[in-house]
Amino acid sequence: MGNVILSSVHLLPYRTMAYNNAWANHRLLAACLALTPEEFTAKRTGFFPSLRATLNHILIIDHFYVDAMEGGTLGPAAFADPEPCATVVALKQAQAAVDRRLLNIVEALDSTGLQRIVSVHRGETIQRERMDRLLLHLFQHDIHHRGQAHSMLSGTSVSPPQLDEFFAVGEAPLRAAEFAELGWTEEQVWGAMDART
């Protein structure tokens, strides 16, 4: 793509994906609040052995990459404790905080920032990636592991929430209560573009 100047329309998908990522985390963790502590920590089939381990993995990877996008050098220290949050309440608060940091990054992006090289500290090496590619990588990572957690929820007393919808106009009333909890409006998510188009 070189030094192509991107319009706000081209930046919009990154904004909306960041909002969708935060919304999906909010929805999934809100459902998990109804789990018993035993259900939250019980061994289950998945890449990680429990809901707690899976959801904490999403959190620490978000910390790892968001710190790099902010220009930090946290690096592998992000993985020092694989399960920093012992409860769903603590996890929901911590995830919301890192989601806000990611939203702040994306809200501040312009075409130059989207093409900026991010230094990802990996211990003995520093990986250099463009911001746009790193954002897409992080969104895909979170989607992947939320899907695993969603499947694990099927084996509990809590019904898995719907996570397979995006921001369809006709479904705005269905997400209005969650947007209110998050302090969002449709116009905020869609930027200067008409939220109804």
Protein language model regions, located:
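General structural signal for secondary-structure boundaries
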Residues: H10, T36-P37, A86-T87, L109-S111, ...
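Helix-adjacent hinge/juxtasegments
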Residues: G72-R116
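Active-site-proximal loop/hinge segments within enzyme catalytic domains
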Residues: S119
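Extreme N-terminal tail/first-helix region
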Residues: G2-Y19, V189-M193
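Long, intrinsically disordered, low-complexity Ser/Thr/Pro-rich regulatory/activation regions
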Residues: A180-T197
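Short, contiguous alpha-helical
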Residues: S8, R15-A80, R122-T185
